[in-house]
Amino acid sequence: MFSSTLARRTAALVQSTGIAKRAFAMGPSSGGAVSDETLEKLGSLSTQALVDGLWVMGWPAAQIDGARPLAPGMKCVGRAVTLNFVPARPDIAQDKPAGGESPEYEAFEKCGPNEVLVMSSTGPWESVGGDIKFLRLKQLSIGGLVTDGSVRDTDEIINYGFPCFSYSTTARQGPAAMQPWECNGIVSLSGTVVRPGDAIIGDQDGVVCVPAKVAEMVYSIAHGREEIEEIVKEELIKNPGPPGKYYPFMSGKVKVDSPLGQLLATKGITPENSNQFEGTADW
């Protein structure tokens, strides 16, 4: 009697307050998709330069902390295809599409050479997969895999040849601890938000997510900064001295008459062709 009465009252409350209409209200998962041309440009830069570019724009943390290359020399560049894991629970295991219809295999099939599979784990030591599952990623020539969790069968995955970045490695299976639940939703890895279509770039220093909506501007800033840093480094090798004469600098605020501004002028970099000077910022 109590449960049926409570159910009726709850239903009435839902209808009267409009909760039913708002329950699934949300914004779009994707903010767009980075073009192949932009991916190539972003991939030509270091992750440090990209992080600096986002920092200059005032955007929040972009590095996926803890995601490290499984082997030296690995580098990944691609559009994010996301997969979210949730803690294991009997009803979730029952309700999740089974077999080949599972969200994880849906995500796999969306991947190719210009995509990076981004897998959000429930913990750094939980396994998101191993050699049998990831054989399919090898067959698809995936651009890379990134997770804030762990992977197993490390040697086999390295031999598959695709770039893999994870928090750690493990011998444990994952299904006992978590279940794949959603493909191409917004995910969070180590506190960094990733949307489907964002640019994912990984190298020896870590993995960075560049939001699709600002990818071109981030490239413009980061490329300009990296160019200046190379000039500064070259000058300090040629004329040894404290780096503080030229470095650090703030993009969009370099003064023409400063030591750095004068050095850049000798290399043909001026406010007319660079957005790094005072008054030239276009972001």
Located regions from the model:
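N-terminal mitochondrial targeting presequence
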Residues: 1-28
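Beta-strand-loop-alpha-helix segment that lines the small-molecule cofactor/substrate pocket
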Residues: 203
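Feature captures the catalytic cores and cofactor-binding loops of soluble hydro-lyases/lyases
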Residues: 25-196, 209-283
